[in-house]
Amino acid sequence: MAPVCVLVGPPGSGKTTVGQALAELLGVEFRDTDLDVEATAGKPISEIFIDEGEAHFRALEREAVAAQLASATGVLALGGGAVLAEQTRAALVGHTVVYLSVELPDAVRRVGLGAGRPLLAVNPRATLKHLLDQRRPYYAAVATATVVTDGRTPEQLAVEVAALLAA
Protein backbone atom coordinates (compact mmCIF):
# COMPACT_ATOMS: atom_id res chain seq x y z
CA MET A 1 0.00 0.00 0.00
CA ALA A 2 1.03 3.59 -0.54
CA PRO A 3 -0.56 6.98 -0.12
CA VAL A 4 -2.29 8.48 -3.16
CA CYS A 5 0.00 11.44 -2.59
CA VAL A 6 2.20 12.93 0.08
CA LEU A 7 2.05 16.67 0.75
CA VAL A 8 5.19 18.48 1.90
CA GLY A 9 5.89 22.14 2.50
CA PRO A 10 6.70 24.72 5.13
CA PRO A 11 4.41 25.92 7.90
CA GLY A 12 1.59 27.91 6.35
CA SER A 13 1.71 26.20 2.96
CA GLY A 14 -1.65 24.51 3.56
CA LYS A 15 -0.64 20.87 3.93
CA THR A 16 -3.41 20.04 6.39
CA THR A 17 -6.13 22.25 4.93
CA VAL A 18 -5.39 21.38 1.31
CA GLY A 19 -4.87 17.74 2.25
CA GLN A 20 -8.31 17.53 3.84
CA ALA A 21 -9.93 19.20 0.83
CA LEU A 22 -8.02 16.93 -1.57
CA ALA A 23 -8.95 13.78 0.34
CA GLU A 24 -12.60 14.81 0.32
CA LEU A 25 -12.45 15.56 -3.41
CA LEU A 26 -10.85 12.16 -4.12
CA GLY A 27 -13.01 10.25 -1.65
CA VAL A 28 -10.03 8.92 0.30
CA GLU A 29 -8.70 9.10 3.85
CA PHE A 30 -6.59 12.01 5.06
CA ARG A 31 -3.70 11.52 7.49
CA ASP A 32 -1.42 14.11 9.06
CA THR A 33 1.77 12.84 10.67
CA ASP A 34 1.72 15.75 13.14
CA LEU A 35 -1.56 14.38 14.50
CA ASP A 36 -0.04 10.89 14.66
CA VAL A 37 2.90 12.24 16.67
CA GLU A 38 0.51 13.97 19.07
CA ALA A 39 -1.51 10.78 19.48
CA THR A 40 1.62 8.72 20.18
CA ALA A 41 2.97 11.24 22.69
CA GLY A 42 -0.41 11.95 24.24
CA LYS A 43 0.19 15.70 24.05
CA PRO A 44 0.41 18.58 21.59
CA ILE A 45 3.60 19.13 19.62
CA SER A 46 4.27 22.36 21.50
CA GLU A 47 4.39 20.37 24.76
CA ILE A 48 6.64 17.70 23.23
CA PHE A 49 9.11 20.47 22.33
CA ILE A 50 8.95 21.90 25.86
CA ASP A 51 9.04 18.60 27.76
CA GLU A 52 11.33 16.41 25.65
CA GLY A 53 12.88 18.74 23.07
CA GLU A 54 13.01 18.94 19.30
CA ALA A 55 15.22 15.84 18.89
CA HIS A 56 12.60 13.66 20.60
CA PHE A 57 9.86 15.20 18.47
CA ARG A 58 11.86 14.53 15.28
CA ALA A 59 12.36 10.88 16.30
CA LEU A 60 8.60 10.48 16.81
CA GLU A 61 8.02 12.24 13.50
CA ARG A 62 10.36 9.86 11.61
CA GLU A 63 8.51 6.88 13.09
CA ALA A 64 5.12 8.35 12.17
CA VAL A 65 6.22 9.10 8.61
CA ALA A 66 7.65 5.60 8.09
CA ALA A 67 4.48 3.99 9.46
CA GLN A 68 2.17 6.10 7.31
CA LEU A 69 4.20 5.67 4.13
CA ALA A 70 3.82 1.93 4.62
CA SER A 71 0.13 1.91 5.49
CA ALA A 72 -1.72 5.04 4.36
CA THR A 73 -3.86 4.72 1.26
CA GLY A 74 -5.16 8.27 0.93
CA VAL A 75 -3.63 11.73 1.19
CA LEU A 76 -0.77 12.07 3.66
CA ALA A 77 0.50 15.42 4.99
CA LEU A 78 3.95 15.50 6.55
CA GLY A 79 5.07 17.98 9.18
CA GLY A 80 7.00 20.94 7.79
CA GLY A 81 10.36 19.70 9.09
CA ALA A 82 9.95 16.02 8.23
CA VAL A 83 12.05 16.34 5.06
CA LEU A 84 15.07 17.41 7.11
CA ALA A 85 15.63 13.75 8.00
CA GLU A 86 17.60 11.84 5.40
CA GLN A 87 15.70 8.69 6.39
CA THR A 88 12.43 10.41 5.49
CA ARG A 89 13.76 11.78 2.20
CA ALA A 90 14.93 8.27 1.24
CA ALA A 91 11.57 6.78 2.22
CA LEU A 92 9.75 9.26 -0.04
CA VAL A 93 11.51 7.96 -3.17
CA GLY A 94 8.94 6.27 -5.39
CA HIS A 95 5.97 8.09 -3.85
CA THR A 96 3.97 10.88 -5.46
CA VAL A 97 5.12 13.89 -3.45
CA VAL A 98 3.55 17.30 -3.97
CA TYR A 99 5.45 20.30 -2.63
CA LEU A 100 3.05 23.05 -1.59
CA SER A 101 5.17 26.15 -2.07
CA VAL A 102 4.41 29.41 -0.26
CA GLU A 103 6.15 32.77 -0.06
CA LEU A 104 6.81 34.51 3.24
CA PRO A 105 3.89 37.02 3.24
CA ASP A 106 1.25 34.31 2.73
CA ALA A 107 2.98 31.94 5.16
CA VAL A 108 3.07 34.63 7.86
CA ARG A 109 -0.60 35.44 7.34
CA ARG A 110 -1.60 31.77 7.51
CA VAL A 111 0.39 30.69 10.56
CA GLY A 112 -0.63 33.68 12.64
CA LEU A 113 2.93 34.35 13.76
CA GLY A 114 3.48 31.38 15.98
CA ALA A 115 0.16 30.35 17.45
CA GLY A 116 0.85 26.80 18.67
CA ARG A 117 4.02 26.41 16.59
CA PRO A 118 7.03 25.92 18.84
CA LEU A 119 9.68 26.71 16.24
CA LEU A 120 8.02 30.08 15.61
CA ALA A 121 7.75 31.15 19.25
CA VAL A 122 10.67 33.61 19.16
CA ASN A 123 10.77 36.27 16.41
CA PRO A 124 8.28 34.33 14.27
CA ARG A 125 8.65 36.28 11.01
CA ALA A 126 12.45 35.97 10.95
CA THR A 127 12.27 32.34 12.04
CA LEU A 128 9.73 31.51 9.36
CA LYS A 129 11.90 33.20 6.72
CA HIS A 130 14.87 31.12 7.90
CA LEU A 131 12.79 27.90 7.79
CA LEU A 132 11.60 28.70 4.26
CA ASP A 133 15.13 29.41 3.05
CA GLN A 134 16.60 26.36 4.80
CA ARG A 135 13.96 23.84 3.75
CA ARG A 136 13.11 24.83 0.16
CA PRO A 137 15.91 22.70 -1.34
CA TYR A 138 14.71 19.65 0.61
CA TYR A 139 11.09 20.09 -0.46
CA ALA A 140 12.17 20.52 -4.08
CA ALA A 141 14.43 17.47 -3.91
CA VAL A 142 11.68 15.08 -2.78
CA ALA A 143 8.86 16.56 -4.87
CA THR A 144 7.47 14.96 -7.98
CA ALA A 145 5.35 18.10 -8.49
CA THR A 146 5.24 21.62 -7.07
CA VAL A 147 2.11 23.71 -6.57
CA VAL A 148 2.32 27.41 -5.68
CA THR A 149 -0.25 28.15 -2.99
CA ASP A 150 0.03 31.94 -2.68
CA GLY A 151 -3.27 33.80 -2.99
CA ARG A 152 -5.30 30.64 -3.65
CA THR A 153 -8.00 28.84 -1.71
CA PRO A 154 -7.60 25.29 -0.39
CA GLU A 155 -10.36 24.17 -2.75
CA GLN A 156 -8.56 25.64 -5.80
CA LEU A 157 -5.36 23.94 -4.71
CA ALA A 158 -7.09 20.60 -4.13
CA VAL A 159 -8.49 20.72 -7.66
CA GLU A 160 -5.03 21.49 -9.07
CA VAL A 161 -3.37 18.67 -7.12
CA ALA A 162 -6.14 16.25 -8.15
CA ALA A 163 -5.55 17.20 -11.80
CA LEU A 164 -1.82 16.54 -11.36
CA LEU A 165 -2.57 13.13 -9.89
CA ALA A 166 -4.90 12.26 -12.77
CA ALA A 167 -2.36 13.28 -15.43
Curated annotation (Swiss-Prot):
Pathway named in the protein's UniProt entry: Metabolic intermediate biosynthesis; chorismate biosynthesis; chorismate from D-erythrose 4-phosphate and phosphoenolpyruvate: step 5/7
Subcellular location(s) of the protein: Cytoplasm
Record family assignment: Belongs to the shikimate kinase family.
Domain of life, per lineage: Bacteria
Record: residues binding ATP: G12, S13, G14, K15, T16, T17, R117, R152
Pfam families xref list: SKI
Native species: Salinispora arenicola (strain CNS-205)
Oligomeric form and interacting partners: Monomer.
Catalysis performed (reactions): shikimate + ATP = 3-phosphoshikimate + ADP + H(+)
Function: Catalyzes the specific phosphorylation of the 3-hydroxyl group of shikimic acid using ATP as a cosubstrate.
Protein name (database record): Shikimate kinase
Binding note for cofactor: Binds 1 Mg(2+) ion per subunit.
UniProt keywords, alphabetically: Amino-acid biosynthesis, Aromatic amino acid biosynthesis, ATP-binding, Cytoplasm, Kinase, Magnesium, Metal-binding, Nucleotide-binding, Transferase
